């Protein structure tokens, strides 16, 4: 086993592995432990009391975080007609139809979000095997299939988080950067938790929010006391 670095040892001294921290203390500790030379992301993982194998307990959606994520998002839009200029004016990185489809089929997939207007889905549908495995397939449930492409692009660019419970019933999401102040990070987390609360499946029984943990890109994972959140 490789020997721990001095930075790793310092983090271990600061972190109590079995402790459940208040959200304020957890975020302050992550910021204190952030030693990378880049602006690390702050990520949250929430264990939900759902049976992810049941289709009626599929938790997914999208929410615009009030303070953004601090991430530069590259957006591709499939649309035509008047929507081309609207998407471009909203900040889309590339807009197209068959030409964009061909580009993606050839391997140009350096996009974080793909948006499509309904009249473009005939083209986008041919990219199912390309976009689907990468989580890029436009979907009306998360607002990426819409006639209002300008709003969709703006949302993606200004901090929209798309989330989906995995097979274990856990939702993972980026909620900001270590450079954000604690208040901004807390607000983002509260907004995302409230969004999850609103779409709790009616068939899900028992405790819905089971466990919350947060971490930074290079830092420790910390358990958070759910009672310290405004939900």
From Swiss-Prot:
GO terms for molecular function: rRNA binding; structural constituent of ribosome; tRNA binding. It holds the Pfam family Ribosomal_L1. One of its GO terms (biological process) is translation. InterPro entries: Ribosom_uL1_bac-type (IPR005878), Ribosomal_uL1 (IPR002143), Ribosomal_uL1-like (IPR023674), Ribosomal_uL1/biogenesis (IPR028364), Ribosomal_uL1_3-a/b-sand (IPR016095), Ribosomal_uL1_CS (IPR023673). The keyword RNA-binding applies. It comes from the Bacteria. Belongs to the universal ribosomal protein uL1 family. NCBIfam families: rplA_bact. Part of the 50S ribosomal subunit. Binds directly to 23S rRNA. The L1 stalk is quite mobile in the ribosome, and is involved in E site tRNA release. This is Large ribosomal subunit protein uL1. It comes from Ruthia magnifica subsp. Calyptogena magnifica. The gene is rplA.
